[in-house]
C-alpha cells in the first residue's frame, strides 16, 4: 500500500503476509481524501478508524496532518502492525485498540469529526455499524461517517445518508450528523 498525499506521500508500507485485511485501493483512497480535504481542516479533526485492517486509512490521515486518530482492530496481529507502523511515522498521534468494534461503539464516550469504517465486505448486518455510530452519538455536530462497502449494498433510506461514491469496486457511503435539519451535499 502507498500513501498518496501529505507529509509521507509516496511512502510504501508493506504489511506482513499473514494479515488478511484488504487495503483500500490507492484510486479509491485518493478520491475519498479529495472529498474530505475539501470539507475538513485535517489539523483540527479527531478521527476514528473502525475495522482498521492494515492501517492504510490511518496512515493517510496522519500524513495529511491529523493529530488524533483512534484505530479499532479485532485482529491482534493487525493491531500490532498498525501500532508499530504509526509509532514510526507519528509517535503519540495514533491510539490502537485491539478489540471488537461493536464493544467499542457501545462503550466509547468520545466524539469524532470523522469516523471511517471498512468492515469486511461479507460481514452480515453491516448496517449495524452505521446504527451503532449514530445510536451511541460518536459524531460531533457536523461530523461524518464514511462507510466503505461493496457495490451490492445501498444505504439511501438511512436518515443520515448523504450520498454514495463509486471508485471501481470500492464504494463509500457518506453519513452526516446534522447541525441543522438541512442536509449538505458533499463538496468534491
Per-region residue spans from a language model:
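Class I S-adenosyl-L-methionine-dependent methyltransferase catalytic core
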Residues: 1-188
Amino acid at each position: 500500500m502507498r500513501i498518496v498525499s501529505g507529509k509521507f506521500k509516496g511512502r510504501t508500507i508493506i504489511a506482513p503476509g499473514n494479515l488478511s485485511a484488504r487495503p483500500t485501493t490507492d484510486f479509491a483512497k485518493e478520491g475519498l481524501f479529495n472529498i474530505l480535504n475539501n470539507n475538513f481542516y485535517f489539523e483540527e479533526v479527531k478521527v476514528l478508524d473502525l475495522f482498521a485492517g492494515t492501517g492504510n486509512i490511518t496512515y493517510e490521515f496522519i500524513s495529511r496532518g491529523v493529530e488524533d486518530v483512534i484505530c479499532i482492530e479485532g485482529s491482534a496481529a493487525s493491531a500490532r502492525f498498525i501500532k508499530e507502523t504509526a509509532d514510526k511515522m507519528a509517535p503519540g498521534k495514533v491510539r490502537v485498540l485491539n478489540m471488537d468494534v461493536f464493544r467499542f461503539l457501545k462503550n466509547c464516550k468520545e466524539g469524532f469529526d470523522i469516523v471511517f469504517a471498512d468492515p469486511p465486505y461479507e460481514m452480515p448486518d453491516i448496517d449495524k455499524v452505521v446504527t451503532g455510530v449514530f445510536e451511541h452519538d460518536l459524531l460531533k455536530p457536523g461530523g461524518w461517517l464514511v462507510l466503505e462497502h461493496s457495490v451490492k449494498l445501498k444505504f439511501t433510506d438511512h436518515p443520515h445518508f448523504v450520498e454514495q461514491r463509486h471508485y471501481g469496486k470500492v464504494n463509500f457511503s457518506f453519513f452526516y450528523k446534522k447541525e441543522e435539519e438541512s442536509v449538505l451535499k458533499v463538496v468534491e
